[in-house]
Amino acid sequence: MEETFLRQIEQHKALIFKVCHTFRNNDAEARRDLFQDIVAELWRAFPRFNGSVKWTTWAYRIALNVAITQDRRKKIATVEWSEALAIDAARQSARPDSEDLSESLAALYQAIAQLNEAEKALILLYLDDLSYADIADITGLTENHVGVKINRIKSKLKTLLFHGKQ
């Protein structure tokens, strides 16, 4: 069982890193702590994983719950993303010769940082190219509600990107 679990973690660690960066992008130590807490919670829950949903769906659900629960416990209202980290992340995602794309991604990361926890979670899943059905499985929302929320978040991001802070 342990070997199977470790293989799954190794295969899907990028998923956990995305959640950690979304919720703790301003503090490397807090990201490491959150990563460890998520892996520990995944390990505790692993015996109950029955394969009725994809492993990634199950892992996202647990990872997001751990991150959001920690924020509520610590009463962290928002996560401030440092501009340097956002630009660095954008450069890693962008083609090396695409400075405009890099700046656009940095602006997008900064706008996402201004969203509330639930909105960050939904947009993270959406940007990871998950279907509305998969997002619904992870969040417990209906597929229609996911679509409505994603569209509202897109509108909010558009406003933040073109008109500044809300």
Language-model-detected regions and their locations in the chain:
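DNA-recognition helix of helix-turn-helix
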Residues: I68, T139-G164
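Helix-turn-helix DNA-binding module
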Residues: A113, E117, D128-H145
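Sigma70-family region 2
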Residues: R24-N26, V39-K54, R73-K74
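A short pre-motif secondary-structure segment
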Residues: L122-I123
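Arg/Lys-rich amphipathic alpha helix in sigma70-family domain 2
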Residues: R48, R61-W81, L101
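Structural recognition of an alpha-helix C-terminal capping motif at a helix-to-coil junction
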Residues: D33-A40, R44, V53-N65
